[in-house]
Amino acid sequence: MAEKRKYSRKYCKFTEAKIDFIDYKDTSLLKYCLSERFKIMPRRLTGTSKRYQEMVEKAIKRARHAAIIPYIVDRKNVVSNPFEGL
């Protein structure tokens, strides 16, 4: 019988840091919850609580509207060409 994988328990980093409010201008904090293509990561991947996930989503949407972070990214900026330099 196959062994079960051991997963580390995910925890909310915002609760651990005791953050009261997530500001839309703090891009270093928001990039933790964004994928490489600047999509909002779900709770099951980041481990954030429901309360903070709602605040993060609202802050990211405000930052996008204010043009602080982009809505989308070009593919050439995300994935480099593996054949470049050969």
UniProtKB/Swiss-Prot annotation:
GO MF annotations in UniProt: small ribosomal subunit rRNA binding; structural constituent of ribosome
Signal peptide start-end: none
GO biological process, one term: translation
Highest rank taxon of the organism: Bacteria
Bilayer-crossing regions: none
Keywords recorded for this protein, A-Z: Ribonucleoprotein, Ribosomal protein, RNA-binding, rRNA-binding
The keyword Transferase is assigned to this record: no
GO cellular component: cytosolic small ribosomal subunit
InterPro entries, alphabetized: Ribosomal_bS18 (IPR001648), Ribosomal_bS18_sf (IPR036870)
Family: Belongs to the bacterial ribosomal protein bS18 family.
Subunit note: Part of the 30S ribosomal subunit. Forms a tight heterodimer with protein bS6.
NCBIfam families: S18
Entry function: Binds as a heterodimer with protein bS6 to the central domain of the 16S rRNA, where it helps stabilize the platform of the 30S subunit.
The protein's name in its UniProt record: Small ribosomal subunit protein bS18
Species, as recorded: Campylobacter concisus (strain 13826)
Gene: rpsR
